[in-house]
Amino acid sequence: MYKVLLIRLTNLDNLIVNSVRTHLMNMGFEVEVNEEIFHLNAELFNWERWQYNADKLLQLVKLTFERYPYDAVIGIGEADGFSDGLNFVFGLSTKKYGLVFLSRLKEEFYGRVINSSLYIERTLKEVTHELGHTLGLGHCNNKECVMNFSVSVEDVDKKGKYFCTSCSDKLNINNKS
C-alpha cells in the first residue's frame, strides 16, 4: 500500500482536504494530512504573471519533505501556478513529489457561477492525476482515465477521477471506478 502525505500550500477548506483524503483512501492509498500550512512565499511569486513558479516550489517541497517516510507528497493550494514554457499548470510532479494549483479549477476563475461540487470533483481528479505521476505513471490515452492529459478545465471535466485498468495494474492497486 502506498503512503501519501497531503500538504496544504495555502489555507484550505477542510471539505477539500477531507474529500481528497477520502477519495484516495477509497482507492487503496494510506493517506495522512500535514495540518501545518506550508506557506507560499513571495520569492516564488512572479509579479509580472501573478502566478507562482511551480518548478521552484516543487524543489522547495522536495527539499523540505525528502526525509519523510512517504511514497508520495502532494501539495495542494488555492493559487495559480506556471512552469517554464507553459502559461499555467493545474499541477506539476516529479518522482515522489507533486503540486496541485486550484485557482483555475474554480468556475469563478472564468467568470462563471460558483459550483462547489464541480470544484471538488476537479480537485479530486487533478490530485489523483499528480499522484499518479509521483508514482511513475505517464499520461494515458484512455479518455476516461484520470491520467489523461488536460490542457483546459473542460478536459478535466471530461475525464474520470479514477485510474483505468491499465494504470491501476501498473500501480498494483484496486480500481474503484
UniProtKB/Swiss-Prot annotation:
Where, in this chain's numbering, is Zn(2+) 1 bound? Answer: 129, 133, 139
Which residues of this protein are catalytic?
Answer: 130 (proton acceptor)
Query: Which superkingdom heads the taxonomic lineage of this protein's source?
Result: Archaea
Keyword Protease present in the record's keywords: the answer is: yes
State which Enzyme Commission number(s) the record gives.
3.4.-.-
Give a GO molecular function annotation for the protein. zinc ion binding
Family note = Belongs to the peptidase M54 family.
Q: Provide the assembly information.
A: Monomer.
Name under which the protein is recorded: Archaemetzincin
Say which species the protein is native to.
Answer: Sulfolobus acidocaldarius (strain ATCC 33909 / DSM 639 / JCM 8929 / NBRC 15157 / NCIMB 11770)
